[in-house]
From Swiss-Prot:
Highest taxon above the source species: Bacteria
InterPro entries attached to this UniProt entry: ORF2/G2P_dom
Entry annotated with the keyword Nucleotidyltransferase: no
Name listed for the protein in its UniProt record: Phasyl DNA replicon protein arp
Presence of keyword Acetylation: no
Molecular function in Gene Ontology: DNA binding
Keyword vocabulary terms for this entry: DNA replication, DNA-binding
Pfam families referenced in this protein's UniProt entry, alphabetically: REP_ORF2-G2P (PF23343)
Record's function text: Essential for autonomous replication of the phasyl DNA replicon.
Cysteine pairings via disulfide bonds: none
GO biological process, one term: DNA replication
Length: 285
């Protein structure tokens, strides 16, 4: 999927709509996280609930949130390395629909396992149309889980290409997930950066619109680990300072004799902003 950005490096509305459409298509397709379970064996397949066309209607605020999340996911993957990042899906063993109960269980897992096992993570709570809750996480591992991984073969449930590191993760979650009330789990490498944005943000947009009922008001659907927050905050602070300096420099030249020069500077700043966004994956506002 080609993601288009404006001159300031932000994702365009058209790109966000495309991401939402991709999220809808994948939510209704045979995604690995919905039909395959490489951590907890399950004999039955639970088809995903179809989403209504309302999921295509993106509010301005949601577009901004999705754009920010998309950039953060991109920067996360670029920072920790594609080979060391994976998608972790956690599904409760029972039918949990209360977001407070879901978060209570997740907090226990977060404190005892996630904070110690992974370098950083981004977590999205996904309420399905039925009300059942599960979690999608982007986790940064200490080992390469991607090298040699044959994605088409794995989608056919042939796991022979999986390396030792990812097999170790699968084994770990088979033993650990039930202790925290989780059943079916899955950890998969990220196939590509654009796919990562499409799958992760597409799910957030489509399911967020469809399933944000009264009981989910005030519930944080997206959460960043402490290390992920520090990483993104440091990058944002640096670029904000850089942007401020450029802006001050720009406005200091506004006089009756330098209108043409200011216009040239504005053009240069737009190009500069887009370049910084392309290199770092962080939006200059």
């Amino acid at each position: 999927m080609l993601l288009n950005k404006d001159r300031f490096g932000k994702l365009t509305s058209k790109s966000l709509d495309s991401i939402a459409a991709l999220g809808l298509r994948e939510a209704n397709a045979e995604l690995p996280c919905l039909f395959r379970n490489n951590s907890i064996e399950s004999s039955s397949k639970t088809p995903p609930e179809p989403l209504s066309p309302l999921a295509f209607e993106l509010s301005t605020n949601l577009k901004k949130s999705a754009s920010a999340l998309a950039w953060n996911v991109q920067y996360f993957v670029d920072t920790y390395g594609l080979s060391n990042v994976g998608f972790l899906t956690l599904t409760f063993r029972d039918h949990v629909t209360d977001p407070k109960e879901a978060q209570r269980r997740f907090n226990s897992l977060k404190t005892n396992i996630l904070a110690k096992r992974y370098r950083a993570y981004i977590r999205v709570m996904e309420p399905m149309k039925s009300g059942r809750i599960h979690y999608h996480l982007l986790v940064a591992l200490h080992s390469d889980i991607r090298t040699g991984f044959d994605f088409p073969a794995v989608y056919r449930q042939d796991y022979s290409s999986a390396n030792k590191a990812i097999r170790s993760e699968w084994s770990f979650w088979r033993k650990t997930a039930p202790k925290y009330g989780f059943g079916r789990t899955e950890l998969m490498p990220v196939r590509s950066n654009s796919e990562g944005i499409g799958r992760y943000v597409g799910k957030y947009i489509s399911k967020g619109i469809e399933s944000r009922t009264e009981q989910f008001k005030g519930v944080r659907l997206v959460e960043y680990s402490r290390k992920a927050k520090s990483l993104l905050r440091a990058s944002s602070s640096f670029l904000t300072g850089l942007m401020s300096g450029v802006a001050n420099f720009r406005y200091s030249f506004i006089t009756s004799r330098t209108i043409w020069a200011v216009n040239q500077l504005l053009t240069a700043y737009a190009v500069f902003s887009a370049l910084v966004g392309r290199i770092t994956g962080v939006i200059l506002l």
